Amino acid sequence: MAADGKNVLIMAGGTGGHVFPALACAREFQARGYTVHWLGTPRGIENELVPQAGLSLHLIQVSGLRGKGKLSLLKAPFTLVKAVLQARRIIGQLKPVCVIGFGGYVTGPGGVAARLCGVPLVIHEQNARAGTANRLLVPLSARVCEAFPGTFEAGEKLRTTGNPVRPELFMDAQRAPLGERRARLLVMGGSLGAEPLNKLLPKALSEVPADLRPEVFHQAGKHHAPITAERYQEAGVEAQVEPFIKDMAHAYGWADLVVCRAGALTVSELAAAGLPSMLVPLPHAIDDHQTHNAQYLAREGAAFLMPQATTGAAQLAERLNEVLMQPEKLNTMARTARRLAKPSATSTVVDICLEVAHG
């Protein structure tokens, strides 16, 4: 454990969308000489990623309430009180200079515990529509960080920081001009793959004239890659189909255009990489937050927002034809995306934490 005044506690869990920005900030804290501790739950992705990063992981027992049965709802107050007490004990032992929450079920009880312990609390919201825990923690927080403007009501506590993303994504890709080669299309469905995109893209690309058709790299997910490759073959479209993308910086650097979902981190990475996109938000995301994320890029002309319910192969093919016939349009979208990026997000979030920690 670090000497007094050098511990920081990060709260983040559940999904990569919460954990990866938190890890970026953890590395920045460490670079400034702080020891980072992590508060999570036993079921989230943090159980794998945080120890891999060499950080101390502390666990509390808490889960979400949406969609639970009556018995779980009746138990909820007792479960939450227990989780707050667990978090308060951990905070009391660590004595961090500040606590920062990035979302996930752990953030609610952890944030309350921070307030009870008198430790400054900072929250960071990755999505354009704030999650329940972060909305409830605003009154308890010393600072509120939002990735996208307008997520929270304006106030003295609020800072628009952007999402912390990997610094290598901001490097300019060395590509030949579009007019001198075929365009390159990157299709991403997340680690599990997005089956609607896996079905849609082969059909849509078959309707793009062969002389205009781009090179295709399609990340289809572990269980969907073989059948997706078959669909491309049946459609007469050449494509490289893979279950995962191991090097996202390389994939972004290769691409001229991306078709994907609109998770908060993905949207921020597209801006960082300066990539135009066609965003198909996950239709059943909580509070429809992916649509709100997509609007951040679409409103400024850096992306096309294409709702899944109204986007078929014909509509997607029409949009692809439109931009592939106008390389300068893609270039303009790319410049707009890069303008919307927040390259200093990680250092800004850490600056805010240390500002409230040390006055």
UniProtKB/Swiss-Prot annotation:
Alphabetical GO biological process terms: carbohydrate metabolic process; cell division; cell wall organization; lipid glycosylation; peptidoglycan biosynthetic process; regulation of cell shape
Main location: membrane
Similarity field: Belongs to the glycosyltransferase 28 family. MurG subfamily.
PANTHER family: GLYCOSYLTRANSFERASE, UDP-N-ACETYLGLUCOSAMINE--N-ACETYLMURAMYL-(PENTAPEPTIDE) PYROPHOSPHORYL-UNDECAPRENOL N-ACETYLGLUCOSAMINE TRANSFERASE 1
Name of the protein in question: UDP-N-acetylglucosamine--N-acetylmuramyl-(pentapeptide) pyrophosphoryl-undecaprenol N-acetylglucosamine transferase
Functional summary from the UniProt entry: Cell wall formation. Catalyzes the transfer of a GlcNAc subunit on undecaprenyl-pyrophosphoryl-MurNAc-pentapeptide (lipid intermediate I) to form undecaprenyl-pyrophosphoryl-MurNAc-(pentapeptide)GlcNAc (lipid intermediate II).
Enzyme class: transferase
Pathway in which the depicted protein is active: Cell wall biogenesis; peptidoglycan biosynthesis
Top-level taxonomy: Bacteria, Pseudomonadati, Pseudomonadota, Gammaproteobacteria, Pseudomonadales
Catalysis: reaction(s): di-trans,octa-cis-undecaprenyl diphospho-N-acetyl-alpha-D-muramoyl-L-alanyl-D-glutamyl-meso-2,6-diaminopimeloyl-D-alanyl-D-alanine + UDP-N-acetyl-alpha-D-glucosamine = di-trans,octa-cis-undecaprenyl diphospho-[N-acetyl-alpha-D-glucosaminyl-(1->4)]-N-acetyl-alpha-D-muramoyl-L-alanyl-D-glutamyl-meso-2,6-diaminopimeloyl-D-alanyl-D-alanine + UDP + H(+)
Pfam families, per the entry: Glyco_tran_28_C (PF04101), Glyco_transf_28 (PF03033)
Name of the encoding gene: murG
GO molecular function annotations of the record: UDP-N-acetyl-D-glucosamine:N-acetylmuramoyl-L-alanyl-D-glutamyl-meso-2,6-diaminopimelyl-D-alanyl-D-alanine-diphosphoundecaprenol 4-beta-N-acetylglucosaminlytransferase activity; undecaprenyldiphospho-muramoylpentapeptide beta-N-acetylglucosaminyltransferase activity
